[in-house]
Amino acid sequence: MKKICVLGGGAIGSCVSASLTDAGLDIILVDQWADHINKIRRDGLSVTTKEGEKNTKVSAYHMSDLAKLQPQFDFILMAVKAYDTQWMSKFASVYLKDKGVFVGLQNAYNDDLNADMVGRENVIGAVVELSCEIFNPGFVQRNTVPSGTWFAVGELSGEITPRLKEVQKIMLNVGKCDLTDNIYGAKWTKLIANSMTCPFSSLNLKNWEAVKLPGMFDFSVGVGRESFKVGKALGYMIEPLFGLTNEDIGNAGEDAAELVMKKMVKDVGPNARTHAAQDHIKGRRSEIEFINGRVSKEGRKLGISTPYNDAVVEIAKMTHSGKIDLDPSNINILFKKLEELIRD
């Protein structure tokens, strides 16, 4: 049986680990959060969905354990924040077999960075549609059940290979999983979706609450339209997400961002918070600079104005620095920042 390591025991990594363990695969979870690993070792990993709670005896290890055990893995599935990409993938490279496969189950655009650390020939890209949250050691809230969870996996070269099908087979234990010959386009499409929910991050609200605030839905659609425009200028072929088809996206035209936003808010359920909102609640750095910030950065290179994404980045900086507290009233600061950027 092939040996699998899930590197990163946050919400995504924990959900994936539980599902793969339940499927009977040879998998271990590795993380630097000592309390989480110790709790799992002692009491198992509890995953709660709308269908109930399930406790799974996941094999969990501290990162320091690997130095002693020196394991070699056929597959490493890395589920860490974008800002931890390079050092974590370098750490992982020591434990990946020569012809092993490294898959980044991450937001943002990290596959080329991962390739620099573990070798391009070892990397497969992935897109993740799985909403989940973790605030306490050993307990995960999974907002999308397996039937509503979706992955796409693709070779960086665009080829459909036997090893890609192996990764698909693994991920089918967690949710639906498609093969793509357009992983860069698929990754940008997910970045578009993430960019539209990042404006919620400083409001201390769940997604469905945030989107009901006056003007918030339209603001998020504005963010998405900019992200679509920049992606198109970069030459990325946009992929359908959230059960939408190419025909749905094509027929929507300029309203594609609005269509995606409506479908996304509907699918993730009433308890979901955007990943950036979870980070802010924990007092941690978010990935906004790697999502909306990436749109802004590429927009500047292309001469495309991105005031909506720029405003989201600026508000995130204010949150990170402690200049503003998490509160629904921050929507007014967000709108004011947008007005300033448009005037400039």
Per-range role (PLM):
Residues 2, 221-344:
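NAD(P)-dependent Rossmann-like dehydrogenase/reductase catalytic/cofactor-binding core
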Residues 31, 51, 64, 106, ...:
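Residues at the C-termini of beta-strands that transition into short coil/loop
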